[in-house]
From Swiss-Prot:
One of its GO terms (molecular function) is 1-deoxy-D-xylulose-5-phosphate synthase activity. Binds 1 Mg(2+) ion per subunit. Binds 1 thiamine pyrophosphate per subunit. Keywords: Isoprene biosynthesis, Magnesium, Metal-binding, Thiamine biosynthesis, Thiamine pyrophosphate, Transferase. Residues 1-20 are annotated as: Disordered. Homodimer. It comes from the Bacteria. CDD domains: TPP_DXS, TPP_PYR_DXS_TK_like. The lineage of its organism: Bacteria, Pseudomonadati, Pseudomonadota, Alphaproteobacteria, Rhodobacterales. This is 1-deoxy-D-xylulose-5-phosphate synthase 1. Its cofactor is Mg(2+); thiamine diphosphate.
């Protein structure tokens, strides 16, 4: 991707090349880098806005610090594309977030410049402190630098880390990338605090750098100048007129213009030269900086599909069915219209989970708690204790962050919190870090928990209604990313009988396939292929991973030679619960062969979801092959491969 449009960037094979450049040349690198990021993401899709906001910061950090010996930790990693280009992965950018390509996040196995993987928020300061302790204990590492956004710093883990870092008092650097914009606008008191800075701190060894920041403010573009003015109000507000960060033991520098290369270099060089303990540098940036369509968009082009660089118009395939997220949001809104006790809780993902649809109709009954899943779960539990009906809508991968609260505050007390688990299963371009692989197992282990999985979007509508009617304890329902199957949607949901599955297709007694979730359509497709080969399979939709429909399972075992379970989850999930329950009931002694199909015992890297499930053996032909193996049939490999294509 090198051409005459990027003469200065072409000279950068790695960060060491930046350190021999003049400040003017570094400015040129940033300008060329920004254009290249836009061009690269236009071809692959990805997290554009956040990456454009840290172009100058990425160049400046690598120019000042001795990476990879100095450890640079990006929080979340949405903003890491400039970093990847600067650290030897420029030629690989066309493979960004593609199967077999480079990750959309930092990843230890990908580069020595990625010392710590990222994707979930608010981990960077903890990791940086760990590297700092390692340095001080004689390990071959230098300074540690954490870059964290104003959304991520709102999470409790960030404060736990800052509290510990302040107590340790060791030399490390935290750069607060303050753009007032994560996926959704940051919420909570800390966001307000960051938005109300009024006076710069001039005490301590960094007084001169603070003065530089203040002097440069008037020269900054209006968005940054306004951000700096807003940010300066952070510093007072405590009785001794120190910042919140200073109270935690950090030296505070800022706010500075995160797009002014001269200012960034001056402050970073000065901080590196003078720091003896933990330092927080507060940078004001503009998400989507330098690309007009991104700067003018409400979400600043946080996550985009492929797009036209000239117009910014994204190429999105026309959907034949609504997304599962949209179906959930609409079903929840309908339920809320009927039942005033229904409320919704989300953790900084109102649009991602679909609860923004309910918020438009009932803004006072939808609560965005910020990046705070632990708090959100307990918050919902207390509302359930008073008779409200909270729907806690959180992605499967992020619900893991609140597991202790699910156990201690919800399940142990038998409180009827409704967990709407979006992005269940494999999710595509975001890869292993965002896969919803484990919720069946970690929720199914809890006494009193009901766990459902929707086979299609119509079933999801019924499960929303079922959750709304369930008051005997916690209940969860899972559904995947992406669009539904196109089945007709009911106007209102039907309350399902707890723990009862359904027969989909009656076979001839050779093999039964018990499906949980949206792989039901693959099971049906597999049955059609098998029928052409003389195998007439029975198919059932379990609907519930817990409690299991033991009457259905017993019937399948007693009337078939083989039973295969299919799920979009990890080991120790649905199949394991079926086997354990069969063992307890003596059903394993009846001679029916039992096989389980689940995700393999490894993390699966990014690719299109269909490719990921094919890799896992959880697609139509994977099911066909499992059936033929268990029955001892010898379908020709040529036939199977032809059907797979």
């Amino acid at each position: 991707m090198t051409d005459t449009k990027t003469p200065t960037l072409d000279r950068v094979a790695g960060p060491a090349d930046l350190r021999s450049m003049s400040d003017t040349e570094l400015r040129n690198v940033a300008d060329e880098l920004r254009a290249e990021v836009v061009e690269a993401v236009s071809q692959t899709g990805g997290h554009l806005g956040s990456s454009l906001g840290v172009v100058e910061l990425s160049v400046a950090i690598h120019a000042v610090f001795d990476t990879p010996r100095d450890k640079l930790v990006w929080d979340v990693g949405h903003q890491c594309y400039p970093h990847k280009i600067l650290t030897g992965r420029r030629k690989q950018m066309p493979t960004l977030r593609q199967g077999g390509g480079i990750s959309g996040f930092t990843k230890r196995s990908e580069s020595e410049y990625d010392p710590f993987g990222a994707a979930h928020s608010s981990t960077s300061i903890s990791a940086a402190l760990g590297f700092t302790i390692s340095r001080d204990m004689g390990q071959p590492t230098g300074d540690a630098v954490a870059v964290i956004g104003d959304g991520s710093i709102s999470a409790g883990m960030a404060y736990e880390a800052m509290n510990n870092a302040g107590h340790e008092g060791r030399r490390m650097f935290v750069i607060l990338n303050d753009n007032e914009m994560s996926i959704a606008p940051p919420v909570g008191a800390m966001s307000s605090y960051l938005s109300s800075l009024s006076e710069l701190s001039r005490a301590g060894p960094f007084g001169g750098l603070v003065a530089i920041a203040e002097g440069m403010e008037q020269l900054a573009p209006k968005p940054v100048r306004d951000g700096a003015r807003r940010a300066r109000e952070l510093v007072t507000g405590l009785e001794n007129r120190g910042t919140f960060f200073e109270e935690l033991g950090f030296d505070y520098i800022g706010p500075i213009d995160g797009h002014d290369m001269a200012q960034l270099l001056s402050v970073l060089r000065g901080a590196k030269a003078r720091a003896t303990g933990p330092v927080l540098i507060h940078c004001c940036t503009v998400k989507g900086k330098g690309y007009a369509p991104a700067e003018g968009s409400a979400d600043k082009y946080h996550g985009v599909s492929k797009f036209d660089v000239g117009t910014g118009v994204q190429a999105k395939a026309k959907a034949n069915a609504p997304s599962y997220t949209a179906v959930f949001g609409d079903a929840l809104t309908t339920l809320a219209e009927e039942d005033p006790s229904v409320v919704a809780v989300t953790a900084a993902m109102p649009s991602g989970t679909g609860v923004d649809r309910m918020a438009k109709r009932f803004p006072n009954r939808v609560f965005d708690v910020g990046i705070a899943e632990q708090h959100g779960v307990t918050f919902a539990a207390a509302m359930a204790a008073t008779g409200l009906k909270p729907f806690c809508a959180i992605y499967s991968t992020f619900l893991q962050r609140g597991y202790d609260q699910i156990v201690h505050d919800v399940a142990l007390q038998g409180l009827p919190v409704r967990f709407a688990i979006d992005r269940a299963g494999l999710v595509g371009a975001d890869g292993a870090t965002h896969a919803g692989s484990f919720d069946i197992g970690y929720l199914g282990a809890l006494p009193g928990m009901v766990v459902m999985a929707a086979a299609d979007e119509a079933e999801l509508v019924h499960m929303v209604a079922t959750a709304g009617a369930h008051n005997d304890g916690p209940i969860a329902f899972r559904y995947p990313r992406g669009n539904g199957t196109g089945v007709p949607l009911p106007e209102t949901g039907r309350v399902l009988e707890i723990g009862k599955g359904r027969m989909i297709r009656e076979g001839d007694g050779e093999v039964a396939i018990l499906s949980l979730g949206t792989l039901l359509s693959d099971c049906e497709a597999a049955a059609r292929i098998l029928e052409a080969e003389g195998i007439n399979a029975t198919i059932a939709d379990a609907r519930f991973a817990k409690p299991l429909d033991m009457a259905l399972i017993a019937n399948l075992v007693q009337t078939h030679k083989a039973l295969i379970t299919v799920e979009q989850g990890a080991m120790a999930g649905f199949g394991a619960m079926v086997l354990q329950s069969m063992a307890a009931e003596g059903l394993l002694d009846l001679g029916c062969k039992v096989r389980t199909m689940c995700l393999p015992d490894r993390f699966i890297d990014q690719a299109a979801p269909a490719e990921m499930y094919r890799d896992a053996g959880l697609d139509t032909m994977g099911i066909v092959e499992q059936v033929t193996r268990v029955l001892g049939r010898d379908l020709k490999v040529v036939t199977l491969n032809a059907k797979r294509r």
